Amino acid sequence: MIEFLALITLISRANALMRPDGVGRLPALGWSSWNAHECDINATVILTAAAQVVKLGLKDLGYEYINIDDCWSIKTHRDPTTNRMIPDADRFPDGIASVASQIHELGLKVGIYSSAGETTCAGYPASLGYEDIDAETFAEWEIDYLKYDDCGVPDNWKDPYTFCVPDTANNAGPFPNGTCPSLPNPAPANYNWSTSPSAERFRRMLDALNTQDRTILYSLCNWGNAAVNTWGAEIGNSWRMSGDISPGRGEVGPDRTRIAVWERIAEITNEMSFLVREYAEFWGWPDADMLEVGNGEGGMTVAENRAHFALWAAMRSPLLIGTKLDTIRQEHLKILKNPTLLTFHQDPIINRPAYPYKWGYNADYTFDAAHPAEYWSGPSPALEGTLVVMLNSENVTSTRMAVWSEVPELQNQDQGDAFEVMDGWTGEDLGCIKEKYEVELDAHDAAVLVVGNAC
């Protein structure tokens, strides 16, 4: 098995954004403020999250970025002398650099947020036209990660055409077979989106970051627009491939946190299933958005939280925790700390995520926002085997079966039809399993297996 896995290790794409010290080669692991706090942030919120990442053992598992999302600056203006953005003194009385320093003292890294427009999504000053100044500022503050959004775009920087993103957070739909029949002003078939105003806006910030004497991981957030999957890896180390994971903000549960909904997890997974095979590689990772694990009493079930994390990890999307860690429930923390999925996600040898190999509920390659591909597999030398994820996308308890002869990584090896299998959730050795493994799953739950050597 190990020899076979070594043979299929791939070489990175020639035009990928390769950064010093391996920054961005693997998908990011960390915590981000937006899903849990939105604009209700300050130094205490950020430093509490950083301390919890250490205290809860998440740092030891590779979670390293503590990201300050939107709303960190003064909203009305830049510094009239330097043109720099000004940290909100009420929220960050000692400035962003002080927060960054304290995070670095914990052995962690710090991220900041801006937008490739005139204002951020919450209406704060953004970086279009100020790329050099802002990149210099972020480097001076010793920032390690930049999330760069796509709000506040002036008319003279808007794209001449509209790109189809078959996502209800972006467009009304419906999306038959993943198409957008009602799309206004579609681009000609030969249009090169890498030369679009969108690509140029994001490229300008990359150029500014590259002039700094500091490596800053660059995360693009344009929600799949402008065919970003075709050029994102040239400009950033990750790029959002869909609309926001929770676009309908405002609904809260009894614990006063936003309620995450399974429908968005399924919809984004469905979109990602048609992208990962072509676009996800070392140095460039499609981003399914920040995690919702642990968000909202009365929202997703524990089973749905498990499936959400399993799918994001298997797809090797960046894993940015988006919940309040000082009040997280143990069952949710256990999901975020799953060693099997984190090992696969951070495998330094294999240059690809898990791919869907069977849709299950639907015929293969069916575009269905409610019932995405249910069977995924990917090789992992770090796990000494193949990761297999089985999803029950139905609304009721149902059985799923992994048939070894259908798993691509287990084919053509002349190894017979029996393999050593481990339960990826519990770590339990399931023994030598012949031909297939069958499991009953709750609604929207996922089984995780590591299929090892022939036996």
Swiss-Prot record:
User: Where does the record place the catalytic residues?
Assistant: 149, 244
What CDD domains is this protein classified in?
Answer: GH27
Q: Which Pfam families match?
A: Melibiase_2, Melibiase_C
Its biological purpose is as follows: Hydrolyzes a variety of simple alpha-D-galactoside as well as more complex molecules such as oligosaccharides and polysaccharides.
User: Is this entry keyworded Lipoprotein?
Assistant: no
| UniProt keyword annotations, A-Z | Disulfide bond, Glycoprotein, Glycosidase, Hydrolase, Secreted, Signal
Q: What is the lineage of its organism?
A: Eukaryota, Fungi, Dikarya, Ascomycota, Pezizomycotina
- What organism, scientifically named, is this protein from? Emericella nidulans (strain FGSC A4 / ATCC 38163 / CBS 112.46 / NRRL 194 / M139)
Glycosylation site residues: 42, 177, 192, 395
Q: Which reaction does it catalyse?
A: Hydrolysis of terminal, non-reducing alpha-D-galactose residues in alpha-D-galactosides, including galactose oligosaccharides, galactomannans and galactolipids
Question: What InterPro entries does its record include?
Answer: Aldolase_TIM, Glyco_hydro_27, Glyco_hydro_27/36_CS, Glyco_hydro_b, Glycoside_hydrolase_SF, Melibiase_C
Write the signal peptide boundaries: 1-16
Top-tier EC class: hydrolase
Q: List the disulfide bonds.
A: 39-71, 121-151
Q: Which GO terms describe its molecular function?
A: alpha-galactosidase activity
Q: One GO biological process from the UniProt record?
A: carbohydrate metabolic process
EC?
3.2.1.22
Which residues does the record give as substrate binding sites? 222-226
Protein's name in the database? Probable alpha-galactosidase B
Localization recorded for this chain is:
Secreted
Q: Which is one Gene Ontology cellular component term of this protein?
A: extracellular region
The family this protein is said to belong to: Belongs to the glycosyl hydrolase 27 family.
